[in-house]
Structure formats: C-alpha cells, structure tokens
C-alpha cells in the first residue's frame, strides 16, 4: 500500500548505489518498518478467494462440511528482509443450528525475524436461507494476537569498519519487545450457487499494538469482495461430478485500511480439474503523489482440483517501481481439503453451496 510505494523509492536509491553494504540496506529496511509503522497494516494474500476464513469470518462453515485450509506466502525473496506468512484454518458446519465454527492460526515474519506476529482467531457464523436460490451468512471473529520486535537480529553502523562487520557490541540499545492484544471483527456474505458478495470489517475495537508503551492503534480495515461463477459446460454434459465441469470465475477484493486502499481483480478458470488464473493488484487511476502510482503487481495462478482437494500456486510479478529484479516477486501456495460427508437420509435440509474456490 502507500508505505510500500514510499519504501520502493528509498530502496531504488539504495540498490542503485554500489557503496551501500547489503547489511546496511537490511538495517535501513527494518528501521523503516519500525519508524513508519508499516507493521500496522494487515497481511495481504494474492489467493484471497481461497483463504476464505481470512477473507471474511462469515465463510466459517460455508462448505457445509469440515474443511481444512493451509496457506503459505513468501514475499520479496530477493531481499534480505523478506516477508514469510503462514496460516492454517479449520471450519465445520453444524446442520441442526445452521451455524459454522472456525479456528484460524496465523504466523507472520517480517525483516528476517526482526518483526513477527502470531494470531489465533475463533470464528462463528449463522446461515439464513432466504429463498431456494439465495442465502445470507453473518459472522463474527475474536482474535488474540502477539507481536514481537527483536533488535538482536539487526547489525548497526557502529559495528562496521573499513574491513567489514566486526561483530563487536554496539552502543545502540538491543532489546526484545512484545505486545499482546484482543481484536474483534465481523462480516456478512450474500450468495447463491453461482455468485457471492461480502463485506467484512476488521479491528473494530482498533487495539493498541505499540511496542513501546505509547499509543499506536491498529487501523480498522474494511473489505468488500465478490465473485461470479460461469459454468461453460454443455448442459447436456453437466453431471454431479464437478471435476468434469468447465467454469470461469471473475473475482475482486477491495480493501481500505487507514489512509491506504488496494484493489485486486481478475479471474480464474477450471477445465477438467486444471485451474488457471490471473489478477491485477492496484488502482492505476489513483496517485498517492506525483510519480507515485498505485500500481503493484500481476498475479498468475496454476492449480489442480479433485473431489475435495484443491491445490493452487500463484506468483506475483511486481510491476511497481519496487521492480521484480530486486524483489524476486512473491510466491504463494494454498491447499484446501473438504471432507465430504454423505447427508443423512432421515431428513433433507435445504442447502445452497457457496461458490468459493470451486
């Protein structure tokens, strides 16, 4: 977002200079993270439509089965101070109460472990069937988060001489800081078996996440997302086996947090179990400043699905001034498995499948 665009200008200046040591660049990068409060912005996933419990708590139980999702993102591997994010979630639908329950764990490492965070979230959703083809889900989420900053991983300028890094103690204060807080979020989605659209609001209580005892509230984040699935399979050939279908699904995700906003839009298609997709991230008509365009990356996806298993790999091609050659882009992989349990014959409950990542 905006802080990343600002950082791209600084990084370009640093990497163009042959006199700047790679460790000094790493130090400057981490200090930018700490002093600009870039850590106050949330993690973003390119495969937002697949990591549904992170997208909106109302998706908890939306598969009407038990579902497990694993997600891994490696951002900017070409830099010393890269980002590594891992998430794991499990959710289940309770037919009798028309409710979904989800549990999500997230681990994020920034700046080669200088800044890190761990989050544990519990989600609840309720499903309301409006008509035979339309349903609404409302969800809430409570999160316990711990964030850390460790200066021991940094190398400071007074530890360098003309011969390079000395390893001697620095006059800068080393330290390890931690902050814990509770976070509240909520969301809702309207959907049928072909489309979905949702609104989610995160950090409703704007918790204080300062490491140093002052006030640094986490800004509220608002996301609006949706998608529509077009089934291109000949109606005469359509069967109950979704693996044989040919579908195209345009999706979008708009998010706004603090003074920054971003838009992801694109589509993915499924042809006999093979998935291909492409998205653009940015708002090209918007400029934060002269010469500072909101133009971030192109995301390409390849994947495979079979019955309850879905695997997707995506790569972000950086198109901003923080160019691909310096950052190495971003890698992301999602593995989703839905445990398909046959319905009981005693009672048939009206269910509308939500077309998330299908």
Question: Residue locations for each model-derived region?
Answer:
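Cleavable N-terminal export/targeting peptides
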Residues: 1-42, 340-358
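Subset of outer-membrane beta-barrel
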Residues: 41-358
């Amino acid at each position: 977002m905006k802080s990343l665009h600002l950082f791209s200008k600084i990084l370009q200046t640093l990497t163009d200079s042959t006199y700047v040591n790679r460790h000094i660049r790493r130090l400057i990068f981490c200090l930018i993270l700490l002093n600009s409060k870039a850590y106050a912005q949330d993690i973003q996933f390119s495969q937002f439509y697949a990591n549904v419990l992170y997208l909106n708590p109302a998706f908890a139980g939306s598969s009407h089965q038990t579902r497990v999702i694993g997600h891994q993102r490696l951002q900017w591997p070409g830099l010393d101070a890269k980002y590594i994010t891992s998430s794991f979630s499990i959710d289940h639908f309770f037919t009798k109460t028309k409710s979904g329950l989800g549990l999500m764990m997230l681990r994020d490492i920034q700046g080669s472990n200088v800044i890190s965070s761990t989050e544990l979230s519990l989600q609840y959703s309720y499903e309301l069937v409006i008509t035979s083809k339309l349903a609404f889900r409302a969800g809430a989420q409570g999160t316990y988060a711990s964030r850390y900053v460790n200066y021991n991983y940094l190398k400071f300028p007074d530890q360098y001489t003309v011969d390079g890094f000395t390893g001697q103690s620095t006059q800068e204060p080393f330290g390890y800081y931690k902050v814990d807080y509770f976070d509240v979020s909520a969301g809702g989605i309207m959907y049928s078996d072909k489309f979905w659209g949702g609104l989610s609001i995160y950090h409703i209580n704007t918790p204080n996440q300062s490491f140093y005892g002052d006030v640094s509230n986490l800004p509220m984040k608002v996301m609006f997302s949706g998608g529509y699935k077009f089934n291109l399979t000949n109606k005469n050939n359509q069967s109950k086996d979704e693996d044989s279908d040919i579908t195209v699904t345009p999706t979008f995700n708009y998010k706004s947090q603090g003074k920054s906003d971003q838009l992801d839009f694109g589509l993915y298609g499924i042809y006999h179990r093979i998935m291909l997709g492409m998205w653009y991230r940015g708002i090209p008509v918007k400029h934060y400043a002269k010469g500072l365009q909101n133009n971030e990356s192109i995301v390409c996806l390849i994947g495979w699905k079979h019955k309850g298993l879905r695997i997707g790999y995506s790569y972000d091609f950086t198109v901003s001034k923080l160019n691909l050659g310096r950052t190495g882009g971003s890698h992301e992989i999602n593995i989703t498995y839905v445990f398909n349990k046959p319905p009981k014959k005693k009672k048939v409950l009206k269910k509308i499948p939500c077309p998330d990542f299908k």
